[in-house]
């Protein structure tokens, strides 16, 4: 299990080192528009899971939403502190 901060650090490292076959690198290369579409898709899936599926399925969908939101942050050069200032 990892925290939100640990996930961000892991994704930032992947963006920096660009390992072959990395889903994160592929998503970053696709650009902000494509990443934004994934954020919307995952948000809808989290909502549908919350309406119609188990807590476990909902948690999994939310984890995917958080992943794609962080990839979007990295693509835009937004760090965690910039987001935390708005919480």
Swiss-Prot record:
Which pathway or pathways does this protein act in? Amino-acid biosynthesis; L-histidine biosynthesis; L-histidine from 5-phospho-alpha-D-ribose 1-diphosphate: step 2/9
Q: Which reaction does it catalyse?
A: 1-(5-phospho-beta-D-ribosyl)-ATP + H2O = 1-(5-phospho-beta-D-ribosyl)-5'-AMP + diphosphate + H(+)
According to its UniProt record, the EC number is: 3.6.1.31
Q: Does the keyword Amino-acid biosynthesis apply?
A: yes
Molecular function (GO) terms for this protein are: ATP binding; phosphoribosyl-ATP diphosphatase activity
Name its GO BP terms in alphabetical order. L-histidine biosynthetic process
Q: Which GO terms describe its cellular component?
A: cytoplasm
Q: Where in the cell is it found?
A: Cytoplasm
Q: Read off the InterPro entries from this record.
A: HisE, PRib-ATP_PPHydrolase-like
Highest taxon listed in the record's lineage: Bacteria
Keyword annotations for this protein, in alphabetical order, are: Amino-acid biosynthesis, ATP-binding, Cytoplasm, Histidine biosynthesis, Hydrolase, Nucleotide-binding
Return the similarity comment.
Belongs to the PRA-PH family.
Q: Which HAMAP family match?
A: HisE
> In its UniProt entry, what is this protein called?
Phosphoribosyl-ATP pyrophosphatase
User: Which organism does this record belong to?
Assistant: Beutenbergia cavernae (strain ATCC BAA-8 / DSM 12333 / CCUG 43141 / JCM 11478 / NBRC 16432 / NCIMB 13614 / HKI 0122)
């Amino acid at each position: 299990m990892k925290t939100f901060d640990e996930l961000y650090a892991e994704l930032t490292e992947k963006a920096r080192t660009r390992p072959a076959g990395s889903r994160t690198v592929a998503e970053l290369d696709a650009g902000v528009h494509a990443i934004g579409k994934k954020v919307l898709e995952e948000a809808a899936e989290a909502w549908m899971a919350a309406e119609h599926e188990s807590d476990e399925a909902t948690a999994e969908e939310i984890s995917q939403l958080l992943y794609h939101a962080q990839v979007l942050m990295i693509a835009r050069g937004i760090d965690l502190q910039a987001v935390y200032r708005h919480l």
